[in-house]
Design a protein with these regions (language model features):
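Alpha-helical transmembrane segments of multi-pass small-molecule/ion transporters
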Residues: 1-324
């Protein structure tokens, strides 16, 4: 039963995620009750995602660091600069929107990307390393980026972010890798498949709960806000695409390509929302929160695209094999 559910979810993820988003937006009073438990769901997804990793696998990432470095450059440099440029081009008189756009693409890589990487058989140690490093750097780099690009001064709760990092990423990841070491790889071979359905359930829960936060903004949409939403959609879609293109140009293998697509495209929007709500006017929060609507849909879309490309490549390889 659980295996059938897992197969169904993986096949129809491009439709399941929009349905979850719609549910959260339409029924926010119900969906919002899940928000306090989202952190625990993230921790569980990190644990499941890390079950495919060993300590030596993470060490190997740093022996061949090019994919990791490229993703960090996309996340830390290209994303914020592109957001700032497009913001000034489209909304030259509205610094709140520009600040929100820059903030949206300055926050670290998303923990939930580990689940998507796991679904499409990406390089889990590479993705785990990216999430950990980017989240550690975030309390120092986000204020610097905002100061440099939009002139805003922000003091972040570094200790609070570090505690969240430890609970959501470090502890579950270390626990999973320790289980792999103690079991001599047996856990790695059996647990990910058994726990995969529960990871999908967590995704449904997280997407539905978090999308409840967007509901107030969706009820008061106007022409300018639709333009902001379109700009965020273009930038978000571009992040995935750039990761894919750079992976092809640098001739990365299939697993690293999957990790680069999701590592370059998915952001920890919750962190951005906390910063925007604490330090900026309410208008700044809109570009950050509207990204919630697109992130999971784009993740499912690019996953579907990857499957089609890989299926096409396999069919061509078979044809060449037969003709040879």
């Amino acid at each position: 039963m659980l295996e059938k559910f897992n197969s169904f979810m993986e096949k129809w993820m491009a439709f399941v995620t929009p349905a979850c988003l719609l549910t959260g937006v339409l029924f926010p009073d119900i969906a919002k009750h899940g928000v306090p438990y989202v952190t625990y769901a993230f921790a569980f997804m990190t644990f499941i995602g890390a079950l495919k990793s060993r300590f030596r696998d993470v060490a190997d990432v740093f022996k061949r660091p090019l994919p990791l470095i490229l993703m960090l450059l996309i996340l830390l440099v290209l994303g914020p600069v592109a957001a700032c440029g497009l913001g000034h081009l489209l909304f030259p008189g509205n610094m709140n929107y520009i600040t929100g756009m820059v903030l949206e693409f300055s926050v670290p890589a998303a923990v939930i990307s580990l689940m998507w990487v796991s679904i499409y058989n990406g390089n889990s140690p590479l993705s785990l390393s990216l999430v950990v490093i980017d989240t550690i750097l975030a309390p120092f780099l986000i204020p610097a980026v905002l100061k440099l690009l939009v002139g805003s001064s922000v003091k972040m709760d570094t200790v609070g972010m570090m505690k969240e990092l430890v609970f959501m990423i470090a502890l579950p990841a270390v626990l999973a890798m320790c289980l792999n070491e103690v079991s001599h790889g047996k856990v790695m071979e059996t647990w990910p498949k058994k726990l995969a359905p529960f990871s999908k359930m967590c995704l449904i829960f997280v997407v539905t709960s978090n999308s409840s936060k967007v509901s107030p903004y969706m009820k008061h949409l106007n022409g300018e806000r639709l333009e902001v939403a379109a700009a965020i959609l273009v930038l978000a879609a571009g992040g995935y695409a750039i990761g894919w293109i750079i992976a092809i140009l640098t001739r990365q293998n299939k697993a690293a390509t999957v990790s680069m697509i999701y590592g370059s495209g998915m952001r920890n929007i919750s962190a951005g929302a906390v910063i925007a709500g604490a330090y900026f006017p309410a208008e700044t929060l809109f570009p950050v929160m509207i990204g919630t609507l697109f992130q999971q849909i784009l993740a499912a879309f690019y996953g579907s695209m990857m499957r089609r490309v890989q299926t096409g490549q396999q069919e061509r390889e078979k044809e060449h094999g037969v003709s040879a």
